[in-house]
Structure formats: structure tokens, C-alpha cells
Amino acid sequence: MSEKSFFEKTGPYKLKILSDHINGKLNSIENSDILIDDISSLKNAKDREITFFSNLAYKKDLKETLAAACVISEVNADLAPKGMPLILCDDPYMGFALISQKFYPKELKTDHLTGQKNNITNNI
């Protein structure tokens, strides 16, 4: 999410719920109950956040990520850090986009685009 302050956040979600949401498959049933609080990039992810991997140019970031889990294709699953909980799916980019929408489904609305007491005159 490029600017989270514009969207209402939901969650946390169990990893199994996120996997089911994108028709993915967990690499281990033992990972089903892991709680995920948010989404992030490989490089910026923290514990309890989920990320994704779909581009081989980011192999180094995948190896170094601190994410709690990763959405990844079965073909690339061996590149993930050993023991990392994975959601396996055909299109990790699309899967992560769907997970992003689950965490941030609603745009925040505001009643005012400017301050209520602003007074704009000819001289501004």
C-alpha cells in the first residue's frame, strides 16, 4: 500500500484465511493460525506482516526479509528462507494485490477538502 493513511485498515487475519482468500495453498498446515497484521514489501516487512515474491531480481531481498510470511509461486518456493511460512499460488503479484484489498478495502472519506475556517480572498 503506497499510502495507507488514505484507506481504512482491517485485520489481523490468520494466514489460512489469507490463503483461502486468494485460492492459494499453505506450504505447511502448521502455519494456518499465524496472525498477519499488515502487508509490506520484501525489504520493509516486519514480523506479523506478509509480503510477496514474483521477480527474480529481488532474490536477495527475499533471503533477507523479516516478513512473517510470503506469497510466492511453487516454482520459486525453494528461494524463500528455510522455514518461512508461504502461500503458494500461480500469480503471487495478483495474490498479494487481493490480500492488499482485504486489509485495505475502503477508502477513507473526508467531509472537507480544505479547512472549515479558510478564507480565500483576492490577495490570498
Task: Describe the predicted segments one by one.
Residues 1-124:
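Domain-scale signature associated with acetyltransferase and cell-envelope carbohydrate enzymes
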